[in-house]
Amino acid sequence: MPVITLPDGSKREFAHSVSTLDVAADIGPGLAKACIAGRVNGELKDACDLIETDSDLSIITAKDEEGVEILRHSCAHLLGHAIKQLFPETKMAIGPVIDNGFYYDIDLDHKLTQEDIDALEKRMAELAKTNYAVDKRVVSWQEARDTFESRGEVYKMAILDENIPKDSTPALYHHEEYIDMCRGPHVPNMKFCQNFKLMSVAGAYWRGNSDNKMLQRVYGTAWADKKALKVHLNRLEEAAKRDHRKIGKQLDLYHMQEEAPGMVFWHNDGWSLFLELEKFIRQKLGQYTYQEVKGPLMMDRVLWERSGHWDKYSEAMFTTSSENREYAVKPMNCPGHVQIFNQGLKSYRDLPLRMAEFGCCHRNEPSGSLHGLMRVRGFTQDDAHIFCTEEQVQQEVSACIKMVYDTYETFGFNSIVVKLSTRPEKRIGDDEMWDRAEEALKQALKANDIEFEILPGEGAFYGPKIEFTLHDCLDRAWQCGTVQLDYALPGRLGATYVAEDNSRQTPVMIHRAILGSLERFLGILIEEYAGKFPAWLSPVQVVVMNITDKQSDYVDEVVNLFKEHGIRATKDLRNEKIGFKIREHTLRRVPYLLVVGDQEMENKEVAVRTREGVDLGKMQIEEFATKLKNQISLRSLNLLED
């Protein structure tokens, strides 16, 4: 006679074993109709699974985030069902849930086309509309293997052979004639899987190993209702318009090419953005009292062995040799900064020592993972390392947090998710050290009134860390900033200071990054602003255009005056209609479009309009220059208003 305790504390007693669906029906027909699964004593279970003992139960519906994840997983099975109907020769591999959707990896000799994807989506819709029930059957390992062997499903057999113990009882989910294997849970009925769309197809190696066969990966998205699906598709459409690769080409900011995969060729305007971003961070470094240093691009293998990178990171490092010595191109700056710290005797009075570098780093990322500016092989880190005593950790971390928030706010990023990763199972140091380290990070976050989520066991082996994830205008998450405590590297590389009692002590090292990679952050900014950069950041801040040749000398005079004020100005003296010029520079997202005719020339004025088409009227040259300089100095996100 199980007693079921619901989230509101109420209890229901049953005379026999019950399922989540039974409990939902006992509460009411509406809940039974909406029930997708249950969380029984903290564990997700299928709606049909029997509860035999007293238990806590939460009923999962499509209104719950977990419910949406479950229906997405079931949509992957629905996709498998459709694939096997249209392409019976297909061998099914894996079909997991991902952010906002799902995918299925399949082995099919026929290369899927867009027409095939459309046909699969249509068949999925036809199947889902029948509202067929999903039948879960728990079987022996051997029965599961026999089932897939009889169907020639070699990948399912491999999963059983390599990943599932022979004494286990796998769950097989029957979608009419289609059978799939999964931990579950899944929806009890396909009525929950009505709002989906297949998005794309790509290549993927079996088990992610390039030595294995290349499979086809079909991606899809699924949501609880039509409205949510439409919102997501609209967001994707907007994201496609904002794609930094597309805008980068339109605005002539940079390019990539096959001869240098994952390396950026910055063009004039793109490099202007890069330098302005670097200048901004450099000013922050001065404000927060950092030294700026520059380490070598390559260092001997011996140093990387001492730091531990050679053992744990060598696959991602580019190497070269000369005169019988092996070198590695640096994937990160920290070992070099310890070498600078080690030059000369350091006292406790020298701490904290804050050392920053715009470090040019290289990592041998897999070619298939490269993506414009977002995932590159050559990148510049706004990296810093703070050498301090353990007593100084909290105040230094607190200053880092302030710096992160100051920086993000300048760019208009105000939605920041913060996570604190704590001690992993395998770690250096004793529990007392970790207690102090984690508490210091918690107190620093609390001192700044920062809400944060704790990720147990997700810290590095050498110390806990804070991660800052910003959300852009499309609510996409970008993990950029980190503050990481390191109790290992300084000791490995011989960093010491003379303590107040004249003993030699090892400093604590704080790894700190705000933007992460300048290249990636610029990619984020291009998409956040859709190429319409704030005036302070814009490669060209002002374009001055003449109406006829008579104003050419005056245009030169205006542009030169702006340049004397430090304003990035250019001119357009082409023999084109002024409307054509305005349209062209509007498309190039220049913040301010200035037009001069005979009257403006006579009165030493300019007619000012913004790229948004706002007419600011006529202004004296110095008046406009002063207003713009003030806006630039404040790093305002907005343009001047009428």
Swiss-Prot record:
It is found in: Cytoplasm. It catalyses: tRNA(Thr) + L-threonine + ATP = L-threonyl-tRNA(Thr) + AMP + diphosphate + H(+). Keywords: Aminoacyl-tRNA synthetase, ATP-binding, Cytoplasm, Ligase, Metal-binding, Nucleotide-binding, Protein biosynthesis, RNA-binding, tRNA-binding, Zinc. Residues 1-61 form the TGS domain. Its cofactor is Zn(2+). The keyword Nucleotidyltransferase does not apply. Catalyzes the attachment of threonine to tRNA(Thr) in a two-step reaction: L-threonine is first activated by ATP to form Thr-AMP and then transferred to the acceptor end of tRNA(Thr). Also edits incorrectly charged L-seryl-tRNA(Thr). One of its GO terms (molecular function) is tRNA binding. GO terms for biological process: threonyl-tRNA aminoacylation. Its EC number is 6.1.1.3. This is Threonine--tRNA ligase. The gene is thrS. InterPro entries: aa-tRNA-synt_IIb, aa-tRNA-synth_II, aa-tRNA-synth_II/BPL/LPL, Anticodon-bd, Anticodon-bd_dom_sf, Beta-grasp_dom_sf, TGS, TGS-like. It comes from the Bacteria. Homodimer. One of its GO terms (cellular component) is cytosol. Residues 243-534 are annotated as: Catalytic. PANTHER family: THREONINE--TRNA LIGASE, CHLOROPLASTIC_MITOCHONDRIAL 2, THREONINE-TRNA LIGASE. Gene3D superfamilies: 3.10.20.30, 3.30.54.20, Anticodon-binding domain (3.40.50.800), Bira Bifunctional Protein, Domain 2 (3.30.930.10), Threonyl-trna Synthetase, Chain A, domain 2 (3.30.980.10). Zn(2+) binds at residues 334, 385, 511. It comes from Shewanella pealeana (strain ATCC 700345 / ANG-SQ1). Belongs to the class-II aminoacyl-tRNA synthetase family. NCBIfam families: thrS. SUPFAM superfamilies: Class II aaRS ABD-related, Class II aaRS and biotin synthetases, TGS-like, ThrRS/AlaRS common domain. Binds 1 zinc ion per subunit. HAMAP family: Thr_tRNA_synth.
